[in-house]
């Protein structure tokens, strides 16, 4: 990857996470009722901080890949929306209210996709912070906020590498402090007021908290999201790391309300001390522990029965069983080895199949089957997506809410069938249930007939641990490629 160009940092658009859904609608304000935003800004300025607005917006990860802004599409979770924090509004645009920017979506879209060069992320000094004053999403199966090292500077090699590794556990709907879950208590975390302070420094965090209190915001809705300065090399210039911050959501109860939330243009505040301060860094955050000791192993015999039933049903065509393995290592492992993990989050697991191609013959298709990890209790939701190998572009997918019950036609009368699933990927599905049609385009929004592809799997957030399940407690999802003999 090319080195960062410090001279244009303020105008580079840097987004943590993004999705393969439509581009921005007209902006709408996201107001937080329990406090006064203008008073908060004034209080921050009176506390010897300078402020800079940063857009918090939805974009299309595959479109970024197509535009040459990313080297690949980062294994986007097909059908799941993401939002991200930008580096900043360019310095030549003076603005105090992001919604006062005329034609904001169009201008941001132009900056995001139209500027030359690869996206680089943005840099923070050790005493700076990013502050989000926001509404959480409307009701959905899952949401989270997460910070990442985008480019990591490795001293031994004297270069940056694109790693996209998380530096802290996600702040998710089971852990976030909001007006509906004050101080992290159980309650309703959806469509609630919240504040997130992203910083490495205790002193900066305390001053921001005091400013929020003076503006009428309750301490019960304030979340401190620690940047571990022992891991993230903070500062500005070519020998420092770049970071991004993003927001994941999945399976809205009301799709229209969810889409409005995703499309809304809101703002984060970059907070910078006006004068030097004595640094007081937070220690590295403790990570939530994966696993409960309870496994899915007792479902192994039923899973084998399902395998045999699938092979028998499609015995008129050739079958090739593909291996499933861990796709992405955890970020704390990857960053030590300089590995790219495409925005890996500890709230899920990442599995993938071997590569294959998928033509358009009616006898050529992919059958995916396994344990429904949501039904087994090991995940809040699970899903699988179809990816191009070259671009890691997720072009089609299916969720556990959609494939529930798919195994019962193969195992009639088996009481364990409800814990299993079967789905199909093909170029044409007609009216088949639990079948996903795989497009060939346009561009990277499809995968060509002869292009190498794979199936990627996720299982998000075990309810009892509030983090992703442990790999060794799951039975891996399986893939069979069928085609004419």
Identify the function of each model-found stretch.
Residues 1-12:
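Bacterial N-terminal signal peptides that target proteins for export
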Residues 17-35:
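Bacterial Sec-dependent N-terminal signal peptides
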């Amino acid at each position: 990857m090319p080195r960062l160009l410090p001279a244009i940092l303020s105008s580079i658009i840097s987004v943590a996470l993004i999705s393969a859904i439509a581009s921005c609608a007209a902006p709408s304000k996201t107001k937080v009722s329990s406090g006064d935003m203008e008073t908060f800004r004034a209080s921050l300025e009176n506390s010897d901080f300078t402020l800079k607005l940063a857009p918090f917006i939805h974009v299309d990860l595959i479109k970024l890949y197509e535009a040459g802004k990313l080297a690949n599409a980062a294994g986007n979770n097909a059908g799941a929306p993401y939002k991200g924090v930008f580096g900043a509004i360019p310095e030549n645009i003076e603005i105090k209210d992001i919604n006062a920017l005329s034609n904001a979506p169009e201008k941001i879209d132009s900056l995001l996709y139209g500027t030359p060069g690869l996206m680089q992320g943005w840099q923070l000094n050790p005493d700076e912070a990013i502050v989000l004053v926001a509404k959480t999403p409307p009701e959905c199966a899952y949401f989270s906020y997460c910070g990442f090292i985008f480019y990591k500077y490795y001293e031994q090699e004297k270069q940056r590498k694109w790693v996209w590794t998380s530096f802290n556990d996600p702040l998710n709907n089971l852990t976030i402090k909001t007006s509906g879950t004050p101080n992290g208590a159980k309650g309703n975390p959806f469509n609630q007021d919240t504040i997130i302070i992203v910083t490495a420094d205790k002193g900066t965090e305390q001053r921001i908290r005091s400013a929020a209190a003076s503006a009428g915001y309750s301490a019960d809705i304030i979340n401190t999201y620690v940047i571990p300065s022992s891991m993230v090399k903070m500062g500005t210039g070519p020998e420092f790391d770049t970071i991004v911050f993003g927001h994941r959501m999945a399976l809205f109860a009301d799709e229209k309300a969810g889409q409005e939330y995703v499309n809304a243009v809101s703002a984060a505040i970059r907070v910078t001390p006006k004068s030097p301060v004595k640094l007081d860094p937070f220690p590295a955050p403790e990570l939530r522990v994966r696993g409960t000791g309870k496994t899915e192993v007792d479902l192994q015999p039923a899973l084998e029965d399902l395998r045999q039933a699938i092979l028998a049903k499609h015995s008129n065509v050739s079958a090739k069983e593909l291996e499933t393995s861990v796709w992405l290592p955890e970020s704390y492992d990857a960053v030590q080895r300089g590995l790219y993990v495409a925005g890996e989050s500890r709230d899920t697991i990442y599995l993938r199949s071997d590569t294959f191609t998928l033509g358009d013959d009616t006898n050529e298709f992919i059958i995916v089957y396994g344990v429904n990890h949501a039904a087994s209790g090991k995940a809040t939701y699970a899903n699988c997506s179809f990816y191009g190998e070259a671009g890691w572009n997720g072009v089609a997918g299916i969720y556990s809410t959609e494939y529930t019950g798919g195994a019962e036609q193969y195992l009639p009368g088996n009481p364990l069938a409800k814990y299993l699933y079967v789905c199909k990927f093909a170029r044409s599905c007609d009216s088949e249930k639990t079948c996903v049609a795989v497009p060939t385009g346009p561009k990277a929004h499809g995968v060509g007939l002869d292009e190498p592809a794979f199936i990627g799997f996720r299982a998000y957030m075990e309810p009892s641990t509030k983090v992703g399940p442990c790999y060794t407690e799951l039975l891996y999802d399986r893939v069979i490629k069928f085609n004419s003999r």
